[in-house]
């Protein structure tokens, strides 16, 4: 052999490392391990609050005592567990799992489908000995067998004195559809992580805003962010039970353009969000933004109310209002909810009175009227362009799973002199297939 021939043969031989790599990533055990890792980290992303502030993680995941003995806020932030679904290692797991599925599809599923379609007739009786289910009959003919199999849903092929029949080829296509569907789901998840964003806003009733408080955004999320429109909170209110418990809270939202013109409008509540141009606004929390008051005959003033630290004894909002022009005296206003009751304390911290909205009380020589409590709505804002792709993948996945349950059954028959040979095999539902073959043989004997 010449040097040029050797060189040519080396060029035409696939690299050994390439084939070994494909064999490795196509290994079912590797795919299962990757799937388990993805499931574990996905669960961690559900259990651990995503996209919260540093102070939140410091308060809930302190260094002493550490959760499970190791999970502190430092470890959590170092590993990226505060934004699991967009970390490089999570996306790498998805890509590796997708590569494993692709390799498995081309190495196993497609060849299996090709083998199922490239059938051949049995020409010799000894070929039936390889089948787990076969019989040799003294009676029977291809002409009588053909209608029996066609009634059972088989597609029959004849050639001289040989017969081949099959049904359930869709069962071989099903696993390929399942693999393709999972790849589509992975692609949707990756695309969503790269192009989506997550934001939070706390907006007072009557105010307008554009999405600015971005908690988390993918590197390609620029086109997903709202640019030429914003949101106006027309009204926020809470429904209370007779016992004073919160039943539901609502936000009447309008989508407005840059000129303030209304484009869309919807009243949202928990689990009933507003959707606009791929961005979803969820009702998640509430607060008290301020209180409107009037001192004597002054214009109505809106004072901001701040959430106070109650050491775990529930939420309270408070503000201070001067009762003298030189600000030397004033009163504190406290409230727990939007039911309209305000508690008034004097400068010494003594309880003065409890006032309802619309009521006027004399205090420190002035008439103080509580006009209205102003609520604020907590909105969670998300955009995930990968969701439609994921939904498509799940639809195909369900279809592929159903297709995979169909048994791929094959039957061969041979007319050889005064002998008739019949046999078959299936990839699942073996008992049902055996009954089908036995029934077919019994019917052949009767003809």
Curated annotation (Swiss-Prot):
Compartment annotation: Cellular thylakoid membrane
One of the protein's GO biological processes: cytochrome complex assembly
GO cellular component labels: plasma membrane-derived thylakoid membrane
Transmembrane segments: 28-48, 87-107, 173-193
Annotated signal sequence range: none
InterPro entries: Cyt_c_bgen_Ccs1/CcsB/ResB, ResB-like_domain
Name this protein carries in UniProt: Cytochrome c biogenesis protein CcsB
Organism from which the protein derives: Microcystis aeruginosa (strain NIES-843 / IAM M-2473)
Gene: ccsB
């Amino acid at each position: 052999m010449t040097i040029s021939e050797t060189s040519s043969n080396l060029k035409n031989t696939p690299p050994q490392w390439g084939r070994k790599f494909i064999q490795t990533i196509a290994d079912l055990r590797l795919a299962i391990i990757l799937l388990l890792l993805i499931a574990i980290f996905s669960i961690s992303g559900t259990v651990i609050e995503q996209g919260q502030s540093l102070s939140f993680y410091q308060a809930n995941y302190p260094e002493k005592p550490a959760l499970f003995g190791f999970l502190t806020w430092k470890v959590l932030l170092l590993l990226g567990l505060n934004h699991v679904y967009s970390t490089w290692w999570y996306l790498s797991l998805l890509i590796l799992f997708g590569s494993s599925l692709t390799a498995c599809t081309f190495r196993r599923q497609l060849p299996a489908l090709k083998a199922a379609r490239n059938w051949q007739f049995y020409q010799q009786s000894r070929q039936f000995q390889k089948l787990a289910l076969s019989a040799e009959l003294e009676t029977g003919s291809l002409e009588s067998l053909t209608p029996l199999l066609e009634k059972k849903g088989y597609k029959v092929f004849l050639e001289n004195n040989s017969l081949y029949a099959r049904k359930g080829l869709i069962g071989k296509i099903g696993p390929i559809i399942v693999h393709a569907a999972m790849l589509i789901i992975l692609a949707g998840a990756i695309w969503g992580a790269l192009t989506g964003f997550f934001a939070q806003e706390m907006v007072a009733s009557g105010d307008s805003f554009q999405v600015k408080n971005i908690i988390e955004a993918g590197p390609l999320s620029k086109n997903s962010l709202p640019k030429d429109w914003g949101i106006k909170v027309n009204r926020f209110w809470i429904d209370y039970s007779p016992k004073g418990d919160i039943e539901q809270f609502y936000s009447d939202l309008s989508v407005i353009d840059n000129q303030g013109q209304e484009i869309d409008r919807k009243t949202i509540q928990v689990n009933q969000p507003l959707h606009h141009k791929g961005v979803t606004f969820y009702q998640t929390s509430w607060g008290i933004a301020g209180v409107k008051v009037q001192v004597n005959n002054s214009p109505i003033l809106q004072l901001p109310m701040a959430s106070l630290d109650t050491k775990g004894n529930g939420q309270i909002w408070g503000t201070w209002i001067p009762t003298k022009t030189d600000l030397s005296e004033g009163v504190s206003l406290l409230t727990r909810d939007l039911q309209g009751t305000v508690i008034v304390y004097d400068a010494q911290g003594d309880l003065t009175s409890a006032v309802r909205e619309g009521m006027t009380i004399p205090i420190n020589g002035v008439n103080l009227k509580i006009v209205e409590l102003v609520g604020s709505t907590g909105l969670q804002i998300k955009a995930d362009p990968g969701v439609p792709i994921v939904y498509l993948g799940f639809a195909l996945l369900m279809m592929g799973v159903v297709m995979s349950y169909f048994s791929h059954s094959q039957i061969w028959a041979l007319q050889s002199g005064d002998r008739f040979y019949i046999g078959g095999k299936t990839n699942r539902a073996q008992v049902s297939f055996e009954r089908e073959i036995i029934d077919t043989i019994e019917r052949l004997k009767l003809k």
